[in-house]
Amino acid sequence: IGFQTGCGFMVGSPFQTSFTLAEDLAFIGEFDPEMCGIGPFIPQKDTPFGKFSAGSVQQTLFLLSLIRLIKPNILLPATTALGTLSPNGRELGIKAGANVVMPNLSPLSERRKYALYDNKLSTGTESAQSLALLKESVKNIGYKIVTARGDIKK
């Protein structure tokens, strides 16, 4: 009917193991989604997992690279969570194999209403007014932002 599928997981979420990560990777291979969103787990203080530690940026980058190898054409975002845990997390994600950025185009005045986790990245490079800064940061690592429709190439 004309839609595409996606799946994903949080890296370093409570009770996750190497085995569950292997199962997640196997599922991605079998399910064959058009997009897979993974990012490090970031606790939110008002949830049952609020006292757990955040996931690892390095492990997330490793898993992004594995997914890129397993599914060469998949749409693979460099998540805001990576940028929240590391000042150059988005760029590191792209260098590890991500090929999608999803900037938050909400006005800065409205961002507090959408707090998925504590200390969520919310900078000028995330707003529509500062898209040029995002383009420049991606250009600085040898890539460019494309704003055309982003269907997967099969």
Give the residues covered by each predicted segment.
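Conserved non-cysteine loop/helix-boundary elements of the Radical SAM core domain that shape
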Residues: 1-4, 10-32, 47-58
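Glycine-centered flexibility motif
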Residues: 6-8, 12, 39, 142
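Auxiliary Fe-S-binding modules of radical SAM enzymes
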Residues: 29-154
